[in-house]
A protein has these predicted regions:
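Start-transfer (signal-anchor) and selected internal transmembrane alpha helices
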Residues: 1-52
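Active-site lumenal/periplasmic loops and adjacent helix-entry segments of GT-C-fold
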Residues: 33-187, 210, 235, 407, ...
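Extracytoplasmic
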Residues: 242, 399-529
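Transmembrane catalytic cores of multi-pass membrane glycosyltransferases
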Residues: 63, 219, 226-330, 334, ...
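Hydrophobic/aromatic-rich transmembrane helices and adjacent perimembrane loops
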Residues: 240, 347-385
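Signature aromatic-anchored transmembrane alpha helix within multi-pass, membrane-resident enzymes
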Residues: 269-270, 374-400
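Short hydrophobic alpha-helices at membrane interfaces in multi-pass membrane enzymes
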Residues: 198-228
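Transmembrane alpha-helical segments
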Residues: 129-137, 176, 188-200, 243-250, ...
Length: 529
């Protein structure tokens, strides 16, 4: 640094003193400010590693076979895929979303199968989710530890009974659900809420400002396109996303001049246009489809046991309501509860699918409150102690087995479901061939390898529900112990079935030839026709 000399009188003497004079920009010689990761970047990275390993360690189960089947059909024909589970046309199936089409394109380019693509999607969806959570919480508060606490609350504060469903992202359910479209849609929802909240509060960087002093229309159109994408990827998650948009705009938008209304109108119009222009299915027609309501009734059972730990966030949410009647998290929680209640009263139980996101206002309000700097008052200390105890209870009763291997488990934590693989059967059954199967696991898994089922187990708008029920009845009649050979032959010919995949409790028909069997489950693969 430059040096200057000054004279300081000490008594009668004058002494030359060396003084350093700071020069602007001198720190640039050392590279400027040293980058330091935020707490969320550190813990988020560790969480990403741990959950990705846990997800890869557990066999894919449940709906994964359905999503793998979707990838297989798109891999075979990207523009005109067949029905995900049957040898039928697939036009109108909502499974063929932009998310699935991108997976199908990747499968065609890489040569990977449906199961491998679904497996690879897990860490990518987790990345979208973690970045979305971080961005969303920063819109709620600048407190650096709030995103870390929000992630912990979202994954641990559920209940003491297992809640496992697509769209539920507790620590345990992440081991099976991360590869689903719902996980990606929830991550995109957090991003959409963050962008919506920032625009409503007029925060963040704005590249262009119009004559009215408001951000340009392009940003609002981009937000609308994001909501349209969520609607196509996972329509029921989009319902919760739209409720969040309403909550943040109603809570934080303070002026409603005509240019403001125009901009939010552009966002809504762009979302509708993006969804309407998708060629694979009509997403708006799903609003009148009640074929899956019956299977979602279970969502309303054991609600307290599955979700009561999230109620620890009620005091924090009440504080936000006391400070502002228009607080977005309060409005979002109220809107979600109203929709869930409507689903129960009306019999449209599919709306119960948003229960996982209904907990978010409770969990995130608690995280924001506990991220406040110290010293804490007595009430906040009590709330923090209760939240820590609740997290421990959730970890030890339900969630801990997701990340603690069985060999290292000292207390017998509940473990993720372990489904058998059907690669042994898929080696013999060609892609597109029709299989008649019974049991719980096989019909949900074998289509993911490429074969079709004579009777799809899940409803799909691409197949009339009466036709699906007729096929199920025919398969039931085929597998009946009292069926005759002529009756079985007629069913097999009707659906072009050439294979049987039967549990060890079923009798193999006399005309079938056993090709392979599983030592793990005792199931038998037999050739017919």
């Amino acid at each position: 640094m430059p040096q200057t000399y000054s004279t300081s009188p000490i008594g009668k003497a004058a002494v030359d003193t060396l003084v350093r004079r700071a020069v602007r920009g001198a720190t640039a010689l050392c590279g400027g400010r040293v980058w330091r990761p935020t707490p969320y970047q550190v813990f988020g990275f560790l969480f990403f590693l741990v959950i990705s390993l846990a997800y890869w360690a557990v066999p894919l189960c449940c709906d994964a076979g359905q999503h793998a089947a979707v990838v297989e059909r798109l891999k075979a024909n990207l523009l005109h895929p067949r029905h995900p589970m049957a040898d039928l046309p697939g036009a109108g199936s909502p499974y063929y979303s932009p998310y699935a089409v991108s997976q199908g394109a990747f499968a065609r380019l890489s040569g990977l199968g449906g199961w491998e693509v679904v497996r690879l999607a897990g860490p990518l969806n987790l990345l979208v989710l973690l970045t979305g959570i971080g961005r969303f919480v920063r819109v709620l508060t600048p407190r650096p530890w709030a995103p870390v606490l929000a992630l912990g609350a979202m994954t641990l504060l559920w209940g003491t009974e297992r809640a496992w469903w697509s769209g539920y992202l507790s620590l345990m359910s992440m081991t099976g659900n991360l590869g689903y479209p719902s996980a990606c849609a929830i991550g995109l929802t957090f991003w959409a809420w963050a962008l919506t909240g920032a625009r409503a509060r007029r925060e963040g960087l704005v590249r262009y400002v119009g004559p009215s002093g408001l951000p340009g229309l392009a940003g609002y159109a981009g937000i609308g396109a994001l909501y349209g994408l969520i609607l196509l990827v996972h329509p029921i998650t989009a319902v919760a996303a739209v409720l969040g948009a309403v909550a943040f705009v109603a809570g934080w938008q303070r002026e409603w001049r005509s240019p403001v209304v125009l901009r939010w109108g552009v966002a809504a119009g762009t979302a509708a246009l993006a969804a309407w222009s998708w060629p694979y299915f009509d997403v708006f027609a799903l609003a009148a489809d009640d074929s899956v309501d019956w299977m979602h009734r279970r969502l309303y059972e054991q609600l307290f046991g599955q979700f009561w730990l999230a109620l620890l966030g009620l005091p924090a949410l009440w504080l936000r309501w006391r400070n502002s009647r228009r607080d977005p998290l309060v409005l979002l929680f109220a809107l979600d509860c109203l929709l869930v209640a409507f689903g129960w009263v009306s019999g449209h139980y599919t709306y119960g699918r948003i229960l996982g996101l209904t907990l978010v206002p409770l969990q995130f309000a608690l995280a924001v409150e506990l991220a406040a700097p110290r010293p804490w008052g007595r009430a906040r200390r009590a709330l923090g102690g209760a939240a820590a105890a609740g997290a421990c209870v959730g970890f030890l009763t339900v969630q801990g087995g997701a990340v603690v291997p069985r060999v290292l488990d000292p207390v017998g934590l509940e473990q993720p479901s372990l489904w058998p693989s059907y690669a042994w059967a898929a080696r013999h059954v060609g892609k597109g061939e029709v299989v008649i199967s019974d049991g719980h696991f096989a019909p949900r898994s074998i289509p993911g390898y490429g074969p079709n089922l004579a009777a799809p187990i899940w409803p799909d708008p691409a197949l009339d529900e009466r036709e699906r029920e007729r096929r199920l009845a025919d398969v039931h009649a085929y597998l009946s112990p009292t069926s005759t050979r002529a009756e079985r032959t007629a069913v097999a010919r009707r659906y072009h079935a050439h294979w049987l995949l039967l549990t060890r409790w079923k009798r193999v028909p006399e005309e079938a030839v056993i090709v392979a069997w599983s030592p793990e489950t005792g199931e038998v693969l037999a050739r017919i026709g």
